[in-house]
A protein has these predicted regions:
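Feature recognizes metal-dependent phosphohydrolase scaffolds
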Residues: 1-241
Length: 241
């Protein structure tokens, strides 16, 4: 999705949350998105959360409900909270629950209730499937893993391709390790290899920089490479249990 409208006063990117509602609420409060009572207060702000709100942590259903509430509240303050598709959302859509914690299941009530809630036509199944894979604001493209040159295209085209793949009517390879939900090379490969590929991808997308989650930064600090053309923002502040 491409952001339409005037440029907001603030653009904030947030990495992986992994069903850790307490850490998420503390972060939102710390950066001035919500007040002490948990109510949205930020005006004229766009927040892009780069995916992986599910799995690992204890607060699966509560996290989804809270984020949806904040999306609605943000709109009342001329703000926008964009949640992107992460590889863990994709896994849940496809029934891969390897990283679902027992407490996550309990948050839905039971295993069967979680399965029912995430069915393709159920409330949370529909919500997860509706998440965009990319968002572009001016010269910055946001995505969970990274967009390789092979899949580099305008934001709307990538979003459409991933949506079709989840429906089983498109190229399912886009959901694999080289696709935008899983790709890690820009933060892991030597810069001599990664940066030329990144430059090519950005040219095809029509952007100057890419902001990604997914690849953990154990230093707890945002990682910048390729002269500021890539930022890795998964600083592991949320649950990895």
């Amino acid at each position: 999705m491409a952001f339409a409208g005037n440029v907001p006063d603030r653009i904030i990117a947030i990495g992986d949350l992994h069903a850790d509602l307490k850490a998420t609420q503390e972060l939102f409060s710390h950066i001035g998105l919500i007040n002490a009572d948990g109510a949205w207060i930020a005006k004229d702000t766009v927040v892009v959360q780069t995916g992986d709100v599910t799995d690992r942590g204890p607060d699966g259903k509560n996290m989804l409900e809270w984020l949806q509430q904040q999306q609605l509240a943000a709109q009342q303050h001329s703000s926008k909270l964009i949640i992107l598709m992460g590889n863990h959302e994709s896994m849940n859509i496809r029934g891969d629950w390897r990283y679902v914690s027992p407490k996550d299941i309990q948050s839905f009530g039971s295993l069967n209730e979680r399965k029912a809630a995430l069915q393709p036509q159920a409330e949370w199944g529909l919500w997860l499937a509706s998440l965009p894979t990319t968002a572009q604001i001016q010269d910055t493209i946001f995505v969970h893993g990274g967009i390789s040159p092979h899949y580099a295209a305008p934001s709307s085209s990538i979003n459409d391709s991933v949506r079709k793949a989840h429906l089983g009517v498109g190229d399912r390879n886009i959901l694999g390790s080289d696709g935008p939900l899983w790709y890690r090379d820009y933060l892991r490969a030597p810069e001599s290899d990664a940066c030329p590929k990144l430059k090519l991808a950005l040219e095809r997308i029509g952007a100057k920089r890419m902001v990604v989650g997914h690849t953990t930064q154990r230093s707890g600090r945002i990682k910048m490479r390729c002269d500021g053309a890539i930022f890795g923002i998964d600083t592991v502040f949320a649950s990895k249990a």
